[in-house]
Amino acid sequence: MDKYQERYLKHQARKKKMLSPSFKPKHKDHRNPKFWDVIKNRKSTRVFGDKDIKIDKLINSIKYIPSSCDRKPLHFYLEDGANNKALLGGLLVGGVGWIHRAKYIMLLFVDMKAYKSPAEKDFMPYLDAGVAVEHLYLTAEALNIAVCYVNPNIREENKEIFNKRFNKEGLLYVGAMILGSY
């Protein structure tokens, strides 16, 4: 049994508890105005300041990202080197001409081994990625980190160099979060 199946079985056990008549949810008051400010103020930023940013809380938040059956297939690679950021600025179609100016480029990948059913392999990785992207957007906004998502489009002739440099594990690339200061 792999780690994804173990996570799935834990998810099933939690779900069973929640369906029990004795289960009582522990909800907080969702009328908190700060929460709604984060929702309303979230934006995609493509121009960054030169201040340093602290991303440890953003990185730590990744463990809380929901995913299908709680398998947590998301992996990330964080790049802050000028040469690699410049290279990514040429490889990632949606980032041409601007992403190299950000403090960090967070490449997002999913491990296809997490998906057991053939029926879910074509679309579920992208649904999980979408949920992860929104989670990272909202967390970045709450932490006052400028952020923008870049779609996973890489020209066919550039895929080999991208994979050799940034995807040695052969995971499915699902996009990048570009992070910097306001």
Enumerate the language-model features and the residues they cover:
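N-terminal amphipathic, basic helical "cap/leader" segment at the start of enzyme domains
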Residues: M1-Y104
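Small-aliphatic-rich amphipathic alpha-helix that forms the alpha element of a beta-alpha
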Residues: I62, M106, A119-F162
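A short coil-to-beta-strand element that immediately follows conserved catalytic motifs
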Residues: K72, I145-Y149, Y173
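Residue-level "edge-of-site" marker
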Residues: H75, N153, L179
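Short secondary-structure boundary segments
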Residues: V110, P152, S181
